């Protein structure tokens, strides 16, 4: 019988996700600029919602590109 380890979130639950912290936000988007899904990031559902909102806000404020065409 195998046991599954509980996955820990890469961000502590007490750490706020801020739209101005672009270095943190870039860890959770692809090289094309798409937001990575929760099953890949390992975030909790609330953190994923906050991350999505922060990325979208950062895009509107021109801190992150909508589409990254470098690739």
Curated annotation (Swiss-Prot):
GO molecular function annotation:
small ribosomal subunit rRNA binding; structural constituent of ribosome
Q: What UniProt keywords are attached to this protein's entry?
A: Ribonucleoprotein, Ribosomal protein, RNA-binding, rRNA-binding
What Pfam families is this protein classified in? Ribosomal_S18
Q: Which GO terms describe its cellular component?
A: cytosolic small ribosomal subunit
Tell me the superkingdom of the source: Bacteria
> Is-annotated flag, keyword Ribonucleoprotein?
yes
Q: Name one GO biological process term.
A: translation
Q: What does this protein do?
A: Binds as a heterodimer with protein bS6 to the central domain of the 16S rRNA, where it helps stabilize the platform of the 30S subunit.
What is the annotated quaternary arrangement, including any partners?
Part of the 30S ribosomal subunit. Forms a tight heterodimer with protein bS6.
Family according to the record: Belongs to the bacterial ribosomal protein bS18 family.
Q: What is the protein named?
A: Small ribosomal subunit protein bS18
What lineage does UniProt assign to this protein's organism? Bacteria, Bacillati, Cyanobacteriota, Cyanophyceae, Oscillatoriophycideae
